[in-house]
Structure formats: structure tokens, C-alpha cells
């Protein structure tokens, strides 16, 4: 949120100004966000990855309004923003993992709002310049094991043996490590116009778009370069009109 500094984790829980527990925020983060493979947390994680990639762009011409994005913005029109010289470019981030039953990314095809006239724009559209679809490859065997244990234990706790709990924990830990491994991530970048007002797009469609040069795909290390390149191309087209 604009001008909200990130917490450091050491903030205490207080009562009447008296400290009741040190480092309470860090404990809360560990309790709330450790399941990095959870779809909601994974989405936040992907957005943060892309924000950090923006900070690696060439600082001579590209700038990120750090004071605005020092903490995540909820329910804003755009997830992220950067500038090429004095021109603003906006980003929408979507994520999906390989184990998701639904292999379609939502594209945020929504109604807009005209702040100049204070009226809604009723025709749905895509409002960001670039859409980054972050795809996470997970181990299907590990995910199946976790899902199977959940299913069995929801029916009966009898099967919750010490051995099974140990296997379950190992699987969970390995899946979390998978989220933190950059080699498991791929990033598809699509310009607004090439979404063709689709409300969702599949991984197969994204792959086709790459082959048709309507999108690009890269690993995390190449992400800053690809975003700079696409912004420069978009700027060049605008100047040539």
C-alpha cells in the first residue's frame, strides 16, 4: 500500500502498551504463510518474485516507484508498475502450478472506472499493459501423496500412523522447497492487445502464442530483460504512429 513501510518481523504483541510477546509478527508470518504451495500464498509469492525482478532492470532508463510498492497493494487496478523514462507501464500477475486441476489462468477481464468523469466503464477489458503468467512445476508424485493422506485422514484418523505423518511432513517440506527453487518457474509475458479479450488462457494457448510471436517465455533470470525489451518495443511502436 502506498507509503506503508514493510514490517521487519520483530514487532511485538502488546497490551496497554506493554509487550506481551516479542517477534510476534514473525511468528504470525510463519503460521500464516509457510504453505507456499497454497494457491493464494503462491500467487502472492509470484507477484513478489516479479516485483523483485523489476528492481533488477536497467536503472538508467527504468524506474520502479518503490515507495508505492514497498508492500503489496490489494485490490488495485494493476499489480505492479514501472517507468521507461517518463512513460508508465503496468503489469498484472497471474500464477498457476502444474498440479492444479484447472490449467487455465484467469486474465482479469473486468469493467473499469473513468476517474476523470467518475463513472464506470461497463465494457469489460484488460487494463494493464503487460500480463505475466507465472507457471510453477511441481512434483506430481509428492502432490498425490499429500492429497491421498488428506483424503484418508479426513475419513478416519486411524490411518494417521507415525510413519505416515513423517512421510506427509517430508512431502510437504519438499513441495515448499520446490516453490523456492527458481528453476521450477516459467514466466509467460503477453501484451494486453494479444489477449484478445479472453477471460482466461491455458498453458497450451500461451505456448502457441509464443510460437506465433504474440508472447514470450523466460526463466526468472531473463525476466527483467524481457520486460525491458517488451516495454522498449511498445514505446517504439507508439512513437512511430
Regions found by a protein language model. Give the residues of each.
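Nucleic-acid endonuclease domains
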Residues: 1-78, 82-89, 94-241
Amino acid at each position: 500500500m502506498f507509503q506503508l513501510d514493510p514490517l521487519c518481523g520483530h514487532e511485538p504483541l502488546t497490551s496497554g502498551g506493554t509487550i506481551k510477546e516479542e517477534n510476534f509478527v514473525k511468528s504470525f508470518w510463519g503460521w500464516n504463510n509457510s504453505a507456499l504451495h497454497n494457491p493464494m500464498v503462491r500467487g502472492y509469492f509470484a507477484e513478489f518474485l516479479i516485483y523483485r525482478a523489476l528492481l533488477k532492470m536497467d536503472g538508467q532508463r527504468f524506474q520502479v516507484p518503490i515507495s508505492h510498492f514497498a508492500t503489496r497493494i490489494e485490490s488495485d487496478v494493476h499489480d505492479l508498475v514501472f517507468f521507461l523514462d517518463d512513460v508508465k507501464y503496468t503489469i498484472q500477475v497471474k500464477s498457476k502450478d502444474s498440479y492444479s486441476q484447472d490449467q487455465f489462468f484467469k486474465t482479469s477481464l473486468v469493467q473499469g472506472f473513468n476517474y476523470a468523469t467518475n463513472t464506470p466503464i461497463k465494457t469489460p477489458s484488460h487494463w494493464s499493459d503487460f500480463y505475466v503468467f507465472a507457471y510453477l512445476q511441481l512434483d506430481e508424485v509428492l502432490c498425490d501423496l499429500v492429497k491421498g493422506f488428506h483424503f484418508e485422514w479426513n475419513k478416519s484418523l486411524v490411518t494417521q500412523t507415525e510413519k505416515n505423518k513423517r512421510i506427509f511432513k517430508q512431502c510437504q517440506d519438499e513441495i515448499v522447497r520446490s516453490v523456492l527453487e527458481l528453476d521450477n518457474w516459467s514466466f509467460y509475458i503477453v501484451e494486453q492487445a494479444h489477449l484478445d479479450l479472453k477471460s482466461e488462457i491455458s498453458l497450451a494457448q500461451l505456448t502457441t502464442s509464443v510460437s506465433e510471436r504474440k508472447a514470450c517465455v523466460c526463466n526468472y533470470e531473463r525476466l527483467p530483460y524481457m520486460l525491458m525489451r517488451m516495454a522498449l518495443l511498445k514505446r517504439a511502436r507508439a512513437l512511430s504512429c
